[in-house]
Amino acid sequence: MRGRLCVGRAAAVAAAVAAAAVAVPLAGGQEGSQGGVRRGSRGTTMVKKRKGRVVIDSDTEDSGSDENLDQELLSLAKRKRSDSEEKEPPVSQPAASSDSETSDSDDEWTFGSNKNKKKGKTRKVEKKGAMKKQANKAASSGSSDRDSSAESSAPEEGEVSDSESSSSSSSSDSDSSSEDEEFHDGYGEDLMGDEEDRARLEQMTEKEREQELFNRIEKREVLKRRFEIKKKLKTAKKKEKKEKKKKQEEEQEKKKLTQIQESQVTSHNKERRSKRDEKLDKKSQAMEELKAEREKRKNRTAELLAKKQPLKTSEVYSDDEEEEDDDKSSEKSDRSSRTSSSDEEEEKEEIPPKSQPVSLPEELNRVRLSRHKLERWCHMPFFAKTVTGCFVRIGIGNHNSKPVYRVAEITGVVETAKVYQLGGTRTNKGLQLRHGNDQRVFRLEFVSNQEFTESEFMKWKEAMFSAGMQLPTLDEINKKELSIKEALNYKFNDQDIEEIVKEKERFRKAPPNYAMKKTQLLKEKAMAEDLGDQDKAKQIQDQLNELEERAEALDRQRTKNISAISYINQRNREWNIVESEKALVAESHNMRNQQMDPFTRRQCKPTIVSNSRDPAVQAAILAQLNAKYGSGVLPDAPKEMSKGQGKDKDLNSKTASDLSEDLFKVHDFDVKIDLQVPSSESKALAITSKAPPAKDGAPRRSLNLEDYKKRRGLI
């Protein structure tokens, strides 16, 4: 009994395969009666062979092999259908009917008539379902072909037309011609024009000619400058146009890419939707079939109970097989539902998720500002705009002799009442910071240069969650990071520089040049007095007084060390003078108590004694001579040297008479060896001889001015 049922099912599947095979046209065949007979005979032979195989297998295989056989037959039918859809020939219904008739006739030859009737009904139902599926697939493929043809026929945006290309070529030609232009003012290199101009210049005088040429040179220089300026402007305009064209082309390319991506995404979504709809349709059909089969079973069981007749083995086995089919269909529906749910999950994953909030301290460090950056930017024009929205690590005090820091967001920039020192500059700006619900103004000097730590980041997150506030997203972090990079590469103009200079001068303690500032204030004061503005003059006078006080304070601070050094030097000088006086007194005291030493060398000067004898000394010598020889012959010897030879003769005669008595006295006479020297020389010699003698034993040492004055009694 079970073998017959398997044979019946195999026959039904074989009929479906034959119907699908008939739909495929024969290449190069002619339509006619002979062709129809051939196709019919071919279909019958194929079915007979397959049925023969099934009958043989059904007798030998077990119940487990029946399911494998059904699966193989279904896969074969699907292959045939796919081949027929790829070729897409016009399907002829009469041929299909003839094929089905031949297959029915074949079934009549092989099996009983009653069974064949039932199986024919099932074959018709299966044929209708297959035709519906083929029609749906053809419609879907037609719609997809229409979409693809529409997409291919639609012109893409951003394409450059022939007119645009021609205009661009003409513009490039004009650019090249403008670049080839040269300066020409109507004169040659020698500043002369045509023959008439040369003749006119020759008729002029040399002075007029030189003046005319000089004027032409000046005019040429002016025209050259104008020409160069115009040329530069033209080149700048060309560059701008080229840049604009490049930007437009880039934008068009971007638009094309976005359109292509959007079209791909839309086509992909359409395909996924169509597949999902098909799967949903299959699932709904399977569920409806299951419900219908269950209702049939309920009706059958109710009828059987009502009749109270014994069940047939065929009905029992058929119910089991139907239950197995139901289980298979339920498994298929579960698979289809799983695939549909997986497709939906994939679509959800493909949708770009919303920007995630910050979850790591490294992500927040990208928009952290250090004290060094704030010091550089505090006077810049973009400071308030760039800083707002960034984060800082602010110090809030000490705990157990350790500094405590918090992560805070900058919500604004304000000016405080106190001017303080920030690195190398001075400012009065403060930051309005927010940590959770708490807001407070801090000076820039309390900002840290270090990065956020893990504990500080977690405390900030807890404060934000407790306050019910949202964390910054990664998109916001990226935007703020771009603004910080723009601030680092900011290009200053003249107005920005003037504002920065004014901002720095506001908080400067003292001007860089006191003299220039003082002269400027004096001029302003004189102008105010001339105009009669006494209030302004008074204000300027107050500024002058403050400036003088600052200058004096700086001078005192500058000369503080210098005055201390000069005081030390003066004190040392006075001490040296006192010590030198003490040394001189001690030295003189030692010289007095010192005994004469014959072996010591003494400083002495020779004295010239020629013609320098004093009259008193000469008289003493003569007296000694007279006393020695016992005669007073020379009483008048100490007379003037100017009397000369007369006196010498008298003296010689007198001595000769006295000495003649003794022979020894004849040889006893004085030979005068003194020479007569002019009076000026004698005076000079006398002056030199009157030099004060040096003190015996006193050391020679240099005297300073104060010692000299003390010795002279001037002090």
UniProtKB/Swiss-Prot annotation:
The keyword Nucleus applies. The gene is Rtf1. This is RNA polymerase-associated protein RTF1 homolog. PROSITE patterns: PLUS3. The modification Phosphoserine is found at residues 58, 631, 660, 702. Component of the PAF1 complex (PAF1C) which has multiple functions during transcription by RNA polymerase II and is implicated in regulation of development and maintenance of embryonic stem cell pluripotency. PAF1C associates with RNA polymerase II through interaction with POLR2A CTD non-phosphorylated and 'Ser-2'- and 'Ser-5'-phosphorylated forms and is involved in transcriptional elongation, acting both independently and synergistically with TCEA1 and in cooperation with the DSIF complex and HTATSF1. PAF1C is required for transcription of Hox and Wnt target genes. Residues 531-565 form a coiled coil. Keywords: Activator, Coiled coil, DNA-binding, Nucleus, Phosphoprotein, Transcription, Transcription regulation, Wnt signaling pathway. Residues 115-135, 233-245 have a biased composition (Basic residues). GO terms for biological process: blastocyst growth; chromatin organization; endodermal cell fate commitment; negative regulation of transcription by RNA polymerase II; stem cell population maintenance; transcription elongation by RNA polymerase II; Wnt signaling pathway. Signal peptide: none annotated. One of its GO terms (cellular component) is nucleolus. Residues 358-489 form the Plus3 domain. It is found in: Nucleus, Nucleoplasm. GO terms for molecular function: single-stranded DNA binding.
